[in-house]
Structure formats: C-alpha cells, structure tokens
C-alpha cells in the first residue's frame, strides 16, 4: 500500500481506462514519506441511530444516550461486527450473497498552506471497476433502463444485471454537529430512509411540506441530522421549519459530505460536494454530472463520438472492459444523439452526462480528485482547499483538529449496503488519529 504513485502516472492510467481525467493539476507529493493509517470499514446493516438508542442495543443504548463514543466499547471489533451483520439477522433482513464484512482502507494525509491532500487505497470485492451507472438499453423499439444495484429485486431475481457505481465518501465536521465526534455517521442514518425499516417513499414524502413537492421536491428520505427534527427521537417527517433549519446551517450545524463517484465524477477528475442537514443535499451550483436522457420520453441526449472512442454505443459484452468507454463526457467524447443512426437491439448508452466545463459554484469545489483501479485495487488522490470560501463547506485551518468518517460503496451497491468507519480525528498539521503531514 505504501508504493509511491505520482499524480502524472495516476492521471495517465485513469485516462487509459475511463477517458480523459481532467482534474486540476496537483503538486507532487512523495507519498512514500507520508505515514499510512490503516482503517477497517465494516458493514453496518440496518443499525440506524434509532437502533443505537433502543433496548435492542443491549445496554449500549444507555451509553449512546449518555454521549459515550462508539469506540469506547467497540474499538478493534470492526471485523467481528461486519462479518456478523453481513451474513443476515435482525439487523440485515436481506443479506447479499458473497458480500464481504469489511474493507481495509489505507489512508494518508498531507497539507500545505492552501490545500488538504488525501490518498486512499482499498481492494474491491469484484474483479472489475464499478464504473457503470444508470445505463439505458435499446430493445429495437425504445430505450429502457438497464442494470440496477445488487439489492434491487430485479437483480436478485436475475431479470437485470448488477450495474452500479463504486464510491468513496468523506464526512467532515468542525465540532458543530452534536454527537458526530462520538457516534459518527450513525447520527445521519434513520428509520424511514431508503432500504431501512419502514422506508418512506412516494406520495407520503411528496406530500410533506418541507421535503416534498412544496419544498425540496423529493420522493424518498435520505440522510439527515436529528437537530433538524422537532425533538430527539422524532421521526423523519417531524421536521423543523425551513427558517429554523436555515439558522442551524448558518451556525455551522451541518456535515460536509463529499463523494468520489466512479461513474459520475471520476472520469472528469472530480468528486461531488454536498452536506447533510435536513436532507442529504448538494452544494449550491452545478455538479459535474447530470442526466443524459429525457426521462419523460426516454430519449438519450448524447452518444459516444465514434471518431474519438471507436463506438457510438456499448454492448453488454463491453461492460467491464477497461479499453471501452464508460462515461459520456460532453466536451471530450460525445456528440448529440442521432435517432436515425441505425440503432440495434442491445445498444447501450450511459444515462448520465458528465461535464467538467459545466460544473459550477460550490458544487464544483472538489476539482482535483484522481482515481484509478488496477489489479483489484483503487487508488484515489484527493485535493481539497482548506477553506473554500463557501458557506455550505467546512472551513479548515492549519493546526486545526476535525472529525471525519469514511464510507465505501463496493460491488455495485447503494444506500446502506456500504462499509463505514467509526468517527476519527483529522489533524491539519496537528496530532490526531489521522495527521495531515505538512509539506512545503
């Protein structure tokens, strides 16, 4: 894990497998000189925050309610917890066959006066890169969705292939979110969310005055902080007012959430930028990804430029072949969709459109995240400004100490079917669980 990977080599490799990796240039860091922190991420199942506070947690609920850190009781138990939960039981009613209980993350951190740099490596469960997401397939008459995540009933029944992107996610706080330093990402995970107990989807969410059609225009429930509900333990729908939530945000009571998405951001050298408050929100501006599809008519907007990548569409047998394109990038490998181009039954196009040029605002802050997959291992080098200057990001400073939590979505899964870490401290030139070493 400690081999040196220069940014130049990493970019060149990423270009070879996924089209142009266009991330902003990073400074050369001698990663062989930076200590490696080995972190075990484990499978959490349906262990929501409500479960942590319930008697089912077997006296752990009393300690959680008292604010004691998870690591006080569970340090060194990550492997045992993950291996137990992934097999199925009360906290995992729908286990996925062949899924591993843990992922070993090797993390290094450095900083200079302007940026934080992270280098992450981990092995994947599958023998291919998870760069497939929201694909559509032509059946001879029309374009239809093709592929789902591994928990989807259509995949479990064999009606659809398992096609979903891998992700590496970082949560970050500066001490302003209650209990994140002690309980980590569990403060964001609640009953009612997708793939949890009593999940709320459809009309019940659309009719909600804050989350639904009259507010955020959402149709499901995603991560949120307890501070945005009317009282401790309140259900997902018992939200405070928009004005009250805005005050929490203005006071810094949100979590920074950044995600490197192998399908939706990696090919343009970026990661998305979001935050968790009353919902899992994206930062202001425009992401590096959008839709490559009119979802009402199921008509693609762009196709591959055959003159540049050799094909105008993929076939099922192309998926997972590194030499084949996987992402449609507006400014580099795409041309407008031509409905009269002689499409054949089985032609496949990505339903997402990537563009580095179109990414704007705070949503585009993570503009230099280079990643590659080789021989079953991802290597990601991430650069982030210490202070982005945006009010939906956490501002860092040299000498500061912060709380971080990591998650990895591996093997074509989404939502809670990931691996997570307990909360850790990150020091920018300061002693911590993870110390970002000063580079000149």
Descriptions of predicted regions:
Residues 24-53, 138-344, 389-440:
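Acidic/polar low-complexity flexible segments
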Residues 8-18:
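Bacterial N-terminal signal peptides
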Residues 24-67, 81-108, 131:
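Sequence context of c-type cytochrome heme-c attachment sites
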Residues 67-77, 189:
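The canonical Cys-X-X-Cys-His
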Residues 365, 372, 380-388:
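A beta-strand/beta-hairpin structural motif
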Residues 105-108, 367-373:
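Beta-strand-rich interaction surfaces with strong enrichment in secreted/lumenal proteins
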Residues 115-122, 378-384:
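Short, well-ordered beta-strand segments enriched in hydrophobic/aromatic residues
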Residues 1-9:
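Bacterial N-terminal signal peptides that target proteins for export
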């Amino acid at each position: 894990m400690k081999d040196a990977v220069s940014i130049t080599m990493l970019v060149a490799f990423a270009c070879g497998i996924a089209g142009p990796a266009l991330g902003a240039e990073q400074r050369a860091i001698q990663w062989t000189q930076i200590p490696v922190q080995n972190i075990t991420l484990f499978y959490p199942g349906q262990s929501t925050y409500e479960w942590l506070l319930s008697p089912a947690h077997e006296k752990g609920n009393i300690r959680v309610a008292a604010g004691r850190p998870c690591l006080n009781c569970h340090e060194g138990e990550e492997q045992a917890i993950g291996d137990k939960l992934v097999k199925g039981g009360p906290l995992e009613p729908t286990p996925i066959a062949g899924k591993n209980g843990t992922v070993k993350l090797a993390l290094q951190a450095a900083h200079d006066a302007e940026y934080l740099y992270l280098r992450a490596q981990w092995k994947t469960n599958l023998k291919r890169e998870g760069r497939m997401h929201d694909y559509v397939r032509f059946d001879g008459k029309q374009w239809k969705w093709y592929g789902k995540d591994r928990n989807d009933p259509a995949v479990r029944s064999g009606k659809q292939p398992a096609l979903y992107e891998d992700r590496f996610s970082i949560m970050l706080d500066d001490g302003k979110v209650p209990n994140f330093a002690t309980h980590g990402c569990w403060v964001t995970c609640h009953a009612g969310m997708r793939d949890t107990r009593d999940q709320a989807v459809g009309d019940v969410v659309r009719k909600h005055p804050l989350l639904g059609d009259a507010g955020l225009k959402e149709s499901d429930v995603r991560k949120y902080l307890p501070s945005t509900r009317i009282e401790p333990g309140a259900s997902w729908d018992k939200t405070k007012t928009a004005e009250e939530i805005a005050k929490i945000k203005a006071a810094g009571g949100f979590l920074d959430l950044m995600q490197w998405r192998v399908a939706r951001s990696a090919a343009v050298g970026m990661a998305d930028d979001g935050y968790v408050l009353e919902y899992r929100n994206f930062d202001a501006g425009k992401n590096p990804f959008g839709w490559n599809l009119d979802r009402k008519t199921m008509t693609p907007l762009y196709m591959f430029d055959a003159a540049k990548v050799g094909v105008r569409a993929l076939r099922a047998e192309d998926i997972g072949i590194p030499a084949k394109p996987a992402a449609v990038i507006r400014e580099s490998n795409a041309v407008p969709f031509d409905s009269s181009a002689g499409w054949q039954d089985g032609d496949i196009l990505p339903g997402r459109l990537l563009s580095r040029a179109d990414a704007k605002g705070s949503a585009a802050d993570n503009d230099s995240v280079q990643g590659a997959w080789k021989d079953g291992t991802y290597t990601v080098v991430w650069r982030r400004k210490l202070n982005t200057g945006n009010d939906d990001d956490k501002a860092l400073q040299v000498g500061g100490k912060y709380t971080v939590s990591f998650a990895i979505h591996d093997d074509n899964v989404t939502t809670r079917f990931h691996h997570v870490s307990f909360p850790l401290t990150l020091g920018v030139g300061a002693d911590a669980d993870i110390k970002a070493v000063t580079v000149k």
